[in-house]
């Protein structure tokens, strides 16, 4: 029996959650991971393999963290210098976490936001990464069948994180490219009315700020609009701020915490913040997720639920020491922002030379790339055809816009901070060759008689890579064999 097959006996024995497809494994977002898992690029061992550009990971400042750890061996209980605290740290810790860690996280969150707002350590709840923290908040706020309004495009993993086990629902707030995908009050009201017409109880709005996949930040007016909207409807606002330290140019990041403190008559108990060290520090493997809620009951219940996904005390101990080093934190935040900005500028500059534009962005570790001109027609079917060529022939794992529920075909999220400079060069060269090939085919097609043009329409999606000739019509779907390192096993943003 294959991995994806469930026989009749197991259908009777297993739960509905175990039997359904709520994980979202069949999304193109995860299909790209499967293609990478089966044929990963390596500059020497597999130079023609798939380059991972679907992983929103920040590896640009690892050297600074490694250098700090090397200089502070006492921060780890697994070194001779830190061994004296081994017993006290290795013993059972309560759900609150280590006090020094919560204090350090609160201070760090304040620094990331420019010191314009302070966070109360007693309101910090820890969870197993942003995925675990997100799900915990949904469990606290919603019953099965309740709905949340989420502006689209949104992070593809939300379909898993927010819905799968909680049985909550997502109602999309449709945003479009005509205003750079900004959220409007009108769009919120339309989505709210749609939920009411479907007899769905709306429990809140969920945003990611800075946005994944757009790489843009919400301005103050939009944040105030969101707060006013949830106050009027007496529903919750959950703000995922896990990319807040990746802002590399103006406008600066504005946290919902700042708006809450400034707005009069704000119902603070409706506001909740999700945070993590996965993106800002580049430590997704440490599985540090944070819930910061202004609601006392949510803090209490989320803390109790966190027993299902605690952060290890060893991890807390190490990070408490690191984040308490204010000189290091200041230097890290400044340098990391600089490096992300430089990589973004280099990447978008080279794309621009190829005639490829991206949404103007100021944050995140990815670009929202516009390939609409390469579609044979403006449909999501054409987007998927183009995506399969990029995955299987160009050998780049980029994520199609449809996996983020965008309303316009032809957009792709491309991550740029999870690789070294040499791999970036290889990726850019592949993109350049691909676009150049398409442009040549387009020129040839324009010169053909109309009947020939129609017959050879698929030439727009043909590509020659390393001596091999491909055509979209002959492309196989992405493989479905799951690697043990796949995000289908290890949740990743």
UniProtKB/Swiss-Prot annotation:
Query: In which family does this protein belong, per the annotation?
Result: Belongs to the class-I pyridoxal-phosphate-dependent aminotransferase family.
| One protein family per Pfam | Aminotran_1_2
Q: Tell me which residues bear N6-(pyridoxal phosphate)lysine.
A: 279
One GO molecular-function entry? pyridoxal phosphate binding
* Recorded metabolic or biological pathway in which this protein acts: Alkene biosynthesis; ethylene biosynthesis via S-adenosyl-L-methionine; ethylene from S-adenosyl-L-methionine: step 1/2
Say what the protein does. Catalyzes the formation of 1-aminocyclopropane-1-carboxylate, a direct precursor of ethylene in higher plants.
Q: Which PANTHER family match?
A: 1-AMINOCYCLOPROPANE-1-CARBOXYLATE SYNTHASE-LIKE PROTEIN 1, BIFUNCTIONAL ASPARTATE AMINOTRANSFERASE AND GLUTAMATE/ASPARTATE-PREPHENATE AMINOTRANSFERASE-RELATED
The molecule here is called 1-aminocyclopropane-1-carboxylate synthase 1
Keyword Repeat applies: no
Q: Give the record's subunit note.
A: Homodimer.
Keyword check for Magnesium: no
Recite the lineage of the species. Answer: Eukaryota, Viridiplantae, Streptophyta, Embryophyta, Tracheophyta
Please give the record's induction comment.
By wounding in fruit and etiolated hypocotyls. By indoleacetic acid (IAA)/benzyladenine/LiCl only in fruit tissue.
Cite the entry's keywords alphabetically. Ethylene biosynthesis, Fruit ripening, Lyase, Pyridoxal phosphate, S-adenosyl-L-methionine
Q: Which Gene3D superfamilies match?
A: Aspartate Aminotransferase, domain 1, Type I PLP-dependent aspartate aminotransferase-like (Major domain)
A single Gene Ontology biological process assigned to it is: ethylene biosynthetic process
Q: InterPro entries, per this entry?
A: Aminotransferase_I/II_large, Ethylene_sulfur-biosynth, NHTrfase_class1_PyrdxlP-BS, PyrdxlP-dep_Trfase, PyrdxlP-dep_Trfase_major, PyrdxlP-dep_Trfase_small
Which PROSITE patterns does the UniProt record give? AA_TRANSFER_CLASS_1 (PS00105)
Question: Known catalysed reaction(s)?
Answer: S-adenosyl-L-methionine = 1-aminocyclopropane-1-carboxylate + S-methyl-5'-thioadenosine + H(+)
Could you say which EC number(s) this protein's record lists? 4.4.1.14
Q: Which organism is it from?
A: Cucurbita pepo (Vegetable marrow)
Cofactor section:
pyridoxal 5'-phosphate
The protein's superkingdom reads Eukaryota
């Amino acid at each position: 029996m294959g991995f994806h097959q469930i026989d009749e006996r197991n259908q009777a024995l297993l739960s509905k959650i175990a039997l359904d497809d709520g994980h979202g494994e069949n999304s193109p977002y995860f299909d790209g991971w499967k293609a990478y898992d089966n044929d990963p690029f390596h500059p020497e061992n597999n130079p023609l393999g798939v380059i991972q550009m679907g992983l929103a990971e920040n590896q640009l400042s690892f050297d600074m963290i490694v250098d700090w750890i090397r200089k502070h061996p006492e921060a780890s209980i697994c070194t001779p210098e830190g061994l004296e605290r081994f017993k006290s740290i290795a013993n059972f810790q309560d759900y609150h976490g280590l006090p020094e860690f919560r204090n350090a996280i609160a201070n760090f969150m304040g620094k990331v936001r420019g010191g314009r707002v302070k966070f109360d350590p007693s309101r910090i709840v820890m969870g197993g990464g942003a995925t675990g923290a997100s799900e915990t908040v949904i469990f606290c706020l919603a019953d099965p069948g309740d709905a949340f309004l989420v502006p689209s495009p949104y992070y593809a993993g939300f379909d898993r994180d927010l819905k799968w086990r909680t049985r909550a629902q997502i109602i999309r707030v449709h945003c479009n490219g005509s205003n750079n995908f900004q959220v409007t009050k009108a769009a919120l009201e339309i989505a709210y009315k749609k939920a009411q017409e479907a007899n769905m109880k709306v429990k809140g709005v969920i945003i990611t700020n800075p946005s994944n996949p757009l790489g843009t930040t919400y301005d103050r007016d939009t944040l105030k609009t969101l707060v006013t909207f949830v106050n009027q409807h007496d529903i919750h606002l959950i703000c995922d701020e896990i990319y807040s330290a990746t802002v590399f140019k103006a406008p600066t990041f504005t946290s919902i915490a700042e708006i809450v403190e400034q707005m009069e008559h704000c119902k603070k108990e409706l506001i909740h913040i999700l945070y993590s060290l996965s993106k800002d520090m580049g430590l997704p493997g440490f599985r540090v997720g944070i819930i910061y809620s202004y609601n006392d009951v949510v803090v209490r219940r989320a803390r109790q639920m966190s027993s299902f996904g605690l952060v290890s005390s060893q991890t807390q101990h190490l990070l408490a020491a690191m984040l308490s080093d204010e000189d290091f934190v200041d230097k890290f935040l400044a340098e990391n922002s600089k490096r992300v900005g430089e990589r973004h500028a280099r990447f978008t500059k080279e794309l621009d030379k190829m005639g490829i534009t991206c949404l103007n962005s100021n944050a995140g570790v990815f670009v929202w790339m516009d390939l609409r001109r390469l579609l044979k027609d403006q449909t999501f079917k054409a987007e998927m055809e183009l995506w399969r060529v990029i995955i299987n022939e160009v050998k780049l794992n980029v994520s199609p816009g449809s996996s983020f529920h965008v309303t316009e075909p032809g957009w792709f999220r491309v991550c740029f901070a999870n690789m070294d400079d040499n791999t970036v060069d290889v990726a850019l060269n592949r993109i350049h060759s691909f676009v150049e090939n398409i442009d040549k085919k387009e020129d040839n097609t324009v010169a053909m008689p109309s009947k020939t043009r129609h017959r050879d329409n698929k030439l727009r999606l043909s590509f020659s890579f390393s001596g091999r000739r491909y055509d979209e019509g002959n492309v196989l779907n992405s493989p479905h064999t799951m690697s043990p390192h796949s995000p289908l096993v290890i949740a990743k943003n």
